[in-house]
Amino acid sequence: MANPYEQDLDRNAANHQPLTPLTYLQRAAMTYPDHVAIIHGRQRITYRDFWRRSLKLASALARHGIGKGDTVTVMLSNTPPMLEAHFGVPMTKAVLHSLNTRLDAAIIAFQLDHAETKVLIVDREFSAVVKEALALAKARPLIIDYDDPDYAADAPYPKGERIGLLDYEQFVAAGDEAFAWSMPDDEWDAISLNYTSGTTGNPKGVVYHHRGAALMAYTNTIHAGMARHAVYLWTL
């Protein structure tokens, strides 16, 4: 006998929307457009501009053929492009792979190959080790250099050389803020790729989906007791 609770109750656009953190930034940009979202050195970026820049990054990536199933890798410290990548990359349905900035060249090369990296965004702070890794890797991604304007002049390590053909700010500037970004087809679609430490062998890839990322954001907000317009110091 057919179950009446399974008849004519299929999932559709009227009763279901995939969980994804992409809608969090979209709502913040609509609700608090002029509120400061990112503080980095002398920079103050509002939610409106955070959203616009993420869209432009997504647009620029899409113009270079990036889409579902592709991996975009970043080697960045706690800078605005890191945050923009967390939204701009999945807006194209691609997957974000964030490298640990303390890895050596051999492990970076392994991850670039294993992830089949198509685009690599590199902070010049880490260009030396990335250049060494690229010499070891089989992957030949599009390299985009990021030059942090707030990188301390007296930092222990000076900025490295440019190793790519494109500059991050120029790359983003060429994007279109009217880009028609895409919700995930399914909330179980991959949003990011991380790697284990590889203590018993090569690092293992760990895939996160949109639903998991969205729920983790809820959990972190509740666990940290973050009130309205709380300012969070990102140190990890």
How should each PLM-predicted stretch be described?
Residues M1-P18:
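Flexible, non-catalytic linker and terminal segments flanking ANL/adenylate-forming cores
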Residues H16-Q17, Y24-Q26, D34-T79, L83-F87, ...:
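Conserved AMP-binding/adenylate-forming core of the ANL superfamily
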Residues T20, Y24-L25, I107, V129, ...:
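Hydrophobic alpha-helical segments typical of transmembrane helices
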Residues P33, I144-D145, G160-Y195, N202, ...:
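Conserved pre-ATP/AMP-binding loop-to-beta segment of ANL
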Residues W51-S59, V172-A178, S192, V206-R228, ...:
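Conserved structural elements of the adenylate-forming
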Residues R63-H64, M91-Q170:
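Structural core segment of the AMP-binding/adenylate-forming
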Residues V72, V89, L120, A190, ...:
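Conserved S/T- and glycine-rich ATP-binding loop of Class I adenylate-forming
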Residues L76-T79, N100, M226, Y232, ...:
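Conserved AMP-binding
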